[in-house]
From Swiss-Prot:
Keywords: Phosphoprotein. GO terms for biological process: vesicle-mediated transport. This is VPS9 domain-containing protein 1. The lineage of its organism: Eukaryota, Metazoa, Chordata, Craniata, Vertebrata. Residues 348-393 are annotated as: Disordered. SMART domains: VPS9. The modification Phosphoserine is found at residue 116. InterPro entries: MIT_dom_sf, VPS9, Vps9-like, VPS9_dom_sf. GO terms for molecular function: guanyl-nucleotide exchange factor activity. Pfam families: VPS9. Residues 487-648 form the VPS9 domain.
Length: 649
């Protein structure tokens, strides 16, 4: 059926996502043993499906489908979660060996983990000193050329081993030969040390001369000023280190030649940055590790204090059951990134439906009457009024649009935030500023090393290549801080998801023409199920750019499903050759997206979007990605408002 075209293409992926989501729910409910079993079951299912696909493949050169990479990514994240859960279970098993404690503090120790389980990392997080050791381990394991003295020491060890072997073969009566061998060994060892010392002194002198020469080149590259800021001095020293590195390696010259031959090839830029950041001894890679450790060390105590000071309810992932102030100040408006090197990249052709073009709309939601709801599209019989209608009927009499709902919600939030939120907000602002500055430093140093990358499109690609390795180990901890700041908002969204999980699509204002003709199975699938599954993949990523791409794909899947449903509805009259209506309008997009958000069961999307809003630069915010992010934020605000209306009842 055409209506199911958007929902039937990724059944194994959907099943794997359901297993993973079940495991996540068990883990957030503080049931680590059951969660551990579900994580292993998810991994086993994915492995079995992929193995069957490979065994059924007849052609050796057949390409791997896109679903395979997604399932491998999901399996990787489940494996990391299972490992963290196993570690947690090990600590729980060791607790009985500790001297008995009063029964009252036990619940507190059970809820000491930080509320952040996205990106494949489970809390508690690693201490900063261990994180730093892991980050610098690769640099220490890299091959290092031996100095002349070290080479001489190895030669002397071999000479001594040979001497001892020959001495063991001599008879006790051959004292003269033993004395000769001893004197010969001492002479050779002394000669090796003298020659090595002379070579090392010469090498050090040449290295110092080269360092001074490269330092002069770095000074000429920068504006010679009498008083330099510490940042400028550090940048100049790093540039001199890059010049010194390139004296011993030829690959930068080869890459510059490739970029000169193909200046507009962005794939070369991606390959260059991937190769550069994979070398732990390159100054840019070392700076990235250093900045990562600095940000992690600043985040860890903040998140730890926020986790221990919170008073979580059992099974709620540290979210309070009630929400007094549902919105953090300034959390809905798109802000410009603070990056100095974020340039507007030319818009690339997109295959997105027409609904994704143009400025963000202010769609209206049809008025929900207090009578029986139309449940035909969802396959359930007509019955008494839904709680969704009761909640919305108690809202003030306003124009029923998402923009007005958002404005009403903004007016209802308290004017003075709680005392506990102010320090967290200040810490968050400071951390965000540090991250922007760190990325700016990495980007500027990369552009200094490879001047041919100093174009708008190449800068954007460099920024994307730098952000992925930079954010990957930091995102779980950074998201935990965002979730602490937006705790009340997530609580409201979570409550709405629990209250209206089974609400029919028509209750949110979705017209029947954009729903399947035949009701879909309630247990396994529902309208726009594929879009909800795609949105669920967002929490598995740890890079802002990939998370943004996931949001764009979600809206595209919504448009595809809506067009399929609409085409199936309009295909009823026989002999009608008129093409179906155009893509769905903005008035229909946000109600559908709100329904998808409700069905996703992911209240942490509030914090994810707040972080994406901050770390997405202008080139994307004014394009399709920014439109999709704004639409998702509007849908989240509407879902949050549903809980507000219910609580006001």
């Amino acid at each position: 059926m055409a209506a199911a075209a958007g929902d039937g293409g990724a059944k194994p992926l959907q099943s794997a996502m359901k297993l993973a989501n079940k495991a996540i729910e068990l883990d957030t409910g503080n049931r680590p043993r059951e969660a551990y079993v579900e994580y292993l079951r998810s991994i086993h299912y994915i492995s079995q499906v992929l193995l069957e696909d490979v065994e059924n493949t007849t052609e050796a050169g057949e390409t791997v489908p896109p679903e395979t990479s997604k399932m491998l990514k999901l399996a990787e994240q489940c494996l990391e979660r299972a490992q963290s859960t196993a570690t947690k279970l090990g600590r729980i098993c060791l607790k009985p060996a500790v001297p008995a404690a009063p029964p009252t503090p036990l619940p507190t120790s059970r809820h000491r983990r930080v509320c952040s389980d996205e990106g494949g990392k489970l809390s508690p997080f690693l201490p900063p000193e261990i994180f730093q050791k892991l980050q610098v381990a690769e640099s220490q394991n890299s091959k290092k050329e031996l100095t002349p003295l070290e080479k001489a020491s190895l030669q002397n060890q071999k000479l001594r081993a040979t001497y001892e072997a020959r001495m063991a073969r001599l008879d006790p009566s051959q004292a003269m030969q033993k004395t000769s061998l001893t004197l010969s060994l001492q002479r050779q060892m002394m000669e090796n040390l003298v020659i090595a010392k002379a070579r090392e002194e010469t090498l050090q002198r040449k290295m110092e001369e080269r360092r001074l020469r490269l330092q002069e080149a770095a000074n000429r590259r920068f504006c010679s000023q009498v008083a330099l800021t510490p940042e400028e001095r550090e940048q100049r020293a790093l540039y001199a280190a890059i010049l010194e590195y390139e004296q011993d390696h030829d690959w930068p010259k080869h890459w510059r030649a490739k970029l000169k031959r193909s200046p507009g090839d962005l794939s070369l830029v991606t390959s260059l940055l991937s190769h550069l950041l994979s070398l732990p001894d390159h100054p840019i890679s070392q700076l990235l590790k250093k900045l990562q450790c600095a940000v992690y060390s600043a985040l860890y105590p903040i998140v730890s204090r926020a986790a221990t000071s919170a008073a979580p309810a059992p099974g709620s992932c540290s979210l309070p059951p009630e929400a007094n102030g549902l919105l953090a100040p300034g959390s809905r408006r798109l802000r410009s990134s603070q990056s100095l090197y974020c340039m507007l990249s030319p818009s690339e052709p997109s295959a997105a439906p027409r609904v994704l073009d143009g400025p963000p709309p202010t769609p209206s939601v049809p008025t929900l009457h207090s009578g029986p709801l139309d449940r035909e599209a969802d396959g359930s019989p007509a019955g008494p009024s839904s709680p969704l209608v009761d909640a919305l009927s108690h809202l003030p009499d306003k124009d029923s649009s998402f923009e007005d709902l958002e404005q009403f919600l903004a007016m209802s939030e308290p004017q003075t935030p709680g005392a506990k939120r102010e320090p967290l907000l200040e810490c968050l602002k400071s951390t965000v500023k540090d991250i922007h500055n760190a990325i700016d430093r990495l980007l500027s140093l990369t552009l200094l090393a490879f001047e041919s990358l100093n174009t708008a499109t190449s800068k954007d690609r460099c920024l994307a290549c730098i952000e992925e390795p930079f954010f990957s180990p930091l995102w779980p901890l950074l998201l935990a801080l965002y979730r602490s700041v937006h705790r009340t908002r997530e609580a409201a969204v979570s409550r709405s998801m629990e209250l209206y999980r089974n609400a029919p699509p028509t209750a949110l204002g979705i017209p029947t023409k954009l729903l399947p003709r035949v009701p879909e199975a309630q247990a396994s699938t529902y309208p726009y199920c594929t879009a909800a599954q795609e949105l669920g993949l967002l929490v598995l990523e740890s890079c802002p750019q990939k998370k943004l791409e996931c949001i764009v794909r979600t809206l595209r899947v919504i448009c595809i499903c809506a067009e399929d449903y609409c085409r199936a509805q309009e295909a009823r009259p026989e002999g009608e050759s008129q093409p179906p209506a155009a893509a769905i309008g903005a008035d229909d997009l946000l109600p559908i997206l709100s329904f998808v958000v409700l069905r996703s069961g992911l209240p942490q999307l509030v914090s994810e979007c707040a972080a994406l809003e901050e770390f997405t630069h202008e080139g994307y915010l004014i394009g399709e990605e920014g439109y999709c992010l704004t639409s998702l934020q509007s849908a989240l605000s509407y879902v949050e408002l549903l809980s507000r209306g219910r609580l006001d009842k």
